Amino acid sequence: FTHSDSDSNIDHKIVYNSTIIATRPNSGVEHLVSYEVLSSTEWGFKNSFTPNLFYKLSKEDIKTKIEALRHYTSEMQPFPHPRSDTAIESLAQFRGAQCGHKYAEAFRTIRSFL
């Protein structure tokens, strides 16, 4: 798992590029996917995040994710900020609707060897 190439955060772009280099086909890594980061990925206007892989989540998974993200006190903000409890749950519902489930997390396959 790595950041998306559509992420607007410079540090995230560096991590993405480093991951691509470190996981070249001869590295032994068979599956590489990117994830979206609220208030960072959606600003990639030249190259928007377009998921092609979804992972079904439960309501309990969403609660656990929000609880974990609350530890990043400088990142979480009140709604309507993208990194708010409400926005995180709303995105999970939207991604779920895209794949026929109540909640989901979205990813983009970069490389996968079968």
Region spans (language model):
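Metal-dependent de-N-acetylase/amidase catalytic core
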Residues: 1-114
